[in-house]
Amino acid sequence: MRLSEILTVALVTGATAYNLPNNLKQIYDKHKGKCSKVLAKGFTNGDASQGKSFSYCGDIPGAIFISSSKGYTNMDIDCDGANNSAGKCANDPSGQGETAFKSDVKKFGISDLDANIHPYVVFGNEDHSPKFKPQSHGMQPLSVMAVVCNGQLHYGIWGDTNGGVSTGEASISLADLCFPNEHLDGNHGHDPNDVLFIGFTSKDAVPGATAKWKAKNAKEFEDSIKSIGDKLVAGLKA
């Protein structure tokens, strides 16, 4: 399904999000299923039947995204961090009590990210081979990320890393923003490989104290990082 068709579906279902700018529409269609500048390869999307065909790609100047011959990647659910068994995370079989950047986020007056409130992306892979460390390519923890999902644009932050070799994972709050009608929870994610996660290598991607870390819901937090996200996305070239 091309992005124009996905956009039509999104409008019919009444899903709400930020407008997808033309340059990002072009990027989505141009890079789908392709990567010439592979930064690291041999990863999965959490589904062993689809093989280790997922990679981190540097084809977009100033950005890193997850690519595969199947398109992009899926969106599994992450519930790590504060309140990791609350709400729709109650049935998460693999939730952990802290995120990779717990010590970094404490400076903003919260104990850790809350998957039910903070729309974060799991990006980068540690502990197992292959590994990928986004910091080695300029990304910084808790930086703004752009997510194209369900034909729409959303913003989140880089909030956790994966200890294994899988990709395509985001907090339950981000998943609900992207796919409000799919009834996702800690044990049920979005399976199609049509989600584009974009991390930025610019220092300008770090919101710091300007983000509403003490937000009451995901939309409030997302709105607080929108101005940064808009500037970063506007600078992307297909």
Swiss-Prot record:
What EC class is this? hydrolase
Q: What temperature dependence does the UniProt record describe?
A: Optimum temperature is between 65 and 70 degrees Celsius.
For the keyword Secreted, the answer is yes
Which InterPro entries does the entry link to? Chitosanase_fungal
- What are the annotated glycosylation sites? 83
Task: List the subcellular locations.
Answer: Secreted
User: Per the annotation, which location comes first and is thus the protein's main one?
Assistant: secreted
What does UniProt give as the signal peptide span?
Answer: 1-17
Provide the induction entry: Expressed during human infection.
Q: What is the effect of changing residue 169 to Q?
A: Reduces catalytic to less then 0.1 percent
Choose any GO biological process term that the UniProt entry carries and state it: polysaccharide catabolic process
Can you quote a single GO CC term?
extracellular region
Protein name in UniProt: Endo-chitosanase
Q: What is the lineage of its organism?
A: Eukaryota, Fungi, Dikarya, Ascomycota, Pezizomycotina
User: What is the gene name?
Assistant: csn
